[in-house]
Regions:
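General secondary-structure edge motif
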Residues: 9, 110, 291-295, 314
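Amphipathic alpha-helical/coiled-coil segments positioned at domain termini
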Residues: 294-392, 396
Length: 420
């Protein structure tokens, strides 16, 4: 029941509705929780040690001279945002295996520190004992830039003679473009509205900014050129085409270059309205700032924190954010989620055996079936065509929403019902 996110009260309700006697009192339930915590921690630590060894083995296939210098991504997740969260979980995941190498579960009533400060402390701790715990150094850190985690790691100087290098999560770098454009639109009048910086246009520019980085993450110059190509592309018109920086050839994403390669420029017409000059002038500094070499150098390699975020979601499925909880429950959820994340549902059978529970053939068949389905979903997510399809469907939804907002009066928004 704990794995299902159901606690003592839920267990009592289930027994009552199923006409079963309540076979546990509160104190016995607490004792059992401690046993589950101890066993889940033991199993999780075994799997994390295995993951570290797999990550080191994967390092032997690279040109890195020291297999003990690992590249990892780190992220933190908290039961509640801001100053009210008492519990949080931070994770470190290996770049090559995509498996969790370490987790740190924090318990603090945030009267003085925000969740961000707890994340910094948790990450610094995991870096500080990586050598004694695993015999490795986290030499390259993939972070989101949303907190002061990296500066905290640098200040703590965990490895003395080894500097920890920062790599940016491309997903979070991409979000900066959307955030900057929305802030600009909000602060500067006249940039929004039809034919200008609508929500759809901002989303498009943000997505293409991210794609420019992802598709050219092996070169700073190529990234910078690709980013500025998207800027000039959306400022082009039939009268003033400006596609010199767009990739050439029939395979180009730029319809103008595609038409030129096929010798069809005489009949070509832009299928979109160019951004007005005042909008282009306003957003150009943002493009220049977000294509600076210092930032793009940290994007070399095309890293992300997607695995950390998937782990975060798994933790709160086991320990829902909507339900009051305790430190023990959060710990159990984190360790169990870590086991499932690294080894699949089969890891739960290992945990049950550690608790002294016998697993029958139905349990094994269920674990095999669920793990097979999990692998199928993972393969589907990794498919580039599927990802492009999701982006296309998202833009179609934005089109529908904008059409509805244009054609109807505003029915929902801040201040709409102030007259009542």
């Amino acid at each position: 029941m704990r794995i299902l996110g159901i606690g003592y009260e839920g267990l009592c309700k289930f027994c009552g509705l199923m006409d079963m006697p309540s076979f546990l009192d509160k104190s016995t339930h607490t004792i059992l929780l401690k046993q589950i915590l101890n066993c889940s921690k033991t199993v999780a630590e075994t799997f994390m040690m295995k993951a570290v060894n797999e990550e080191k083995q994967a390092m032997t296939t690279t040109e890195n001279e020291d297999i003990n210098h690992l590249t990892v991504s780190g992220d933190g997740t908290w039961q509640q945002r801001g100053y009210t969260s008492s519990f949080g979980v931070s994770s470190i995941i290996g770049y090559f295996t995509g498996k969790i190498l370490d987790i740190n579960i924090k318990n603090a009533y945030c009267k003085l520190w925000s969740s961000g400060k707890m994340e910094v402390d948790a990450m610094v701790e995991m870096f500080s004992y990586s050598e004694t715990k695993y015999g490795v150094k986290y030499a390259n850190y993939i972070g989101d830039g949303d907190s002061k985690t990296y500066s905290g790691i640098i200040k703590s100087d965990p490895y003395k003679n080894t500097t920890v290098n920062k790599k940016e999560c491309i997903g979070h770098v991409q979000k900066r473009m959307g955030s900057r454009l929305r802030t600009l639109k909000s602060n500067q009048k006249g940039l929004g509205g039809r034919g200008k910086l609508t929500g759809k246009v901002i989303d498009k520019l943000t997505v293409y900014y991210g794609l420019a980085i992802r598709r050219h993450c092996d070169s700073i110059e190529n990234m910078k050129s690709a980013i500025m190509a998207t800027f000039y592309h959306y400022g082009s018109s039939d009268e003033k085409p400006n596609h010199d920086m767009c990739p050439k050839g029939e395979e180009s994403w730029c319809s103008y270059q595609h038409a030129e390669a096929r010798g069809e420029l005489d009949t070509y017409s832009h299928d979109y309205s160019p951004l007005p000059s005042d909008v282009l002038k306003a957003i150009k500094p943002i493009y220049e700032d977000l294509s600076n070499e210092n930032l793009l150098s940290r994007c070399i390699g095309g890293f992300n924190q997607n695995n950390n975020e998937r782990f975060n979601q798994l933790v709160w499925k086991i320990c829902p954010k909507t339900v009051n909880t305790s430190y023990t429950i959060v710990q159990i959820a984190a360790y169990v989620a870590m086991c499932i994340f690294n080894e699949g549902i089969n890891s739960l059978l290992v945990l049950m055996n550690t608790l002294g529970l016998n697993c029958g053939p139905n349990s094994h068949r269920y674990a095999e079936r669920m793990d097979a389905a999990r692998m199928k979903v993972a393969d589907k997510r990794a498919n580039d065509n599927t990802r492009e399809g999701r982006l296309q469907r998202r833009h179609q939804q934005i089109d529908i929403l904008e059409a509805a907002m244009t054609g109807e009066e505003l029915l929902y928004g801040p201040g709409i019902d102030d007259s009542v």
